[in-house]
Amino acid sequence: MTKITKIEVQKNNKERFNLFLDEVFEMGIDIDTLVRFNLKKGQILEPSDMENIQKYEHYRLGINMAIQYLSYKKRTEKEVRQHLQQNEISDIAIQQVIDYCYRESYINHEDYAESLKNTMINTTDKGPEIFRQKLYQVGIEPNIINTYVPIYEEEQSFEAVIEVAKKIMKTKKGPEIKIRQKVLQSLIQKGYSMDVVQQAIAELNFEQDENILDDLLQKDLEKVYTKQRRKYDGQQLVMKTIESLMRKGYKYDKIKSKLEESGILDE
């Protein structure tokens, strides 16, 4: 048995106390622990009492960590659980803390999904598939994901998708077919469905300025020809050059005309 000889308020936190047993510092305790066990100077504690106090204090430590972690932004159960594990809270205490967070609505996965949906639609250029992935990564239940992804699709305006496509298109140069492919790939990577992507692409004008396209073809021709002549010569060199340029999206008649203009066909 031990005796509580002193309980003092901690200097840096008025809601925590230092507990002294038999004149020796034993541990710091939270105000809730103090009240729950009605601890006071002169009280005699059995070993079982100390075990219960330590377990409860560990639980309270976990709650305080969780609340502080949740104070910065909304979190999911998975995120809170990982945070507590990283801070060496026991598995039993973690589950108790998680249960507490649900009871007090500190954790609410539907609220989390709603908030993330609004944030992504209003501040990012990402589509519903990226939204789905983010929900999955933080441990949101499948039924909630399947409920909120269609809502995301419905609330994200088609005009916004077209604007994203236009911005992508402005950064690309080259033949029409290649730019179309790059815009399609970029939109898919941003999480838009193929159906929405194809509808958006149908609204865009991919025609390129002929002078700019001619300059690009000339530059690509020089690069490709220089590279291919290290391996081939004669007619084979010409064919390999044409094949490479066609894979880049240039039309055969434009390539042939540029080859004639460059004098390569006469070599």
Swiss-Prot record:
Its main location: cytoplasm. InterPro entries: RecX_HTH_1st, RecX_HTH_3rd, Regulatory_RecX, WH-like_DNA-bd_sf. GO terms for biological process: regulation of DNA repair. Keywords: Cytoplasm. Transmembrane segments: none annotated. GO terms for cellular component: cytoplasm. Disulfide bonds: none annotated. It is found in: Cytoplasm. Belongs to the RecX family. Modulates RecA activity. This is Regulatory protein RecX.
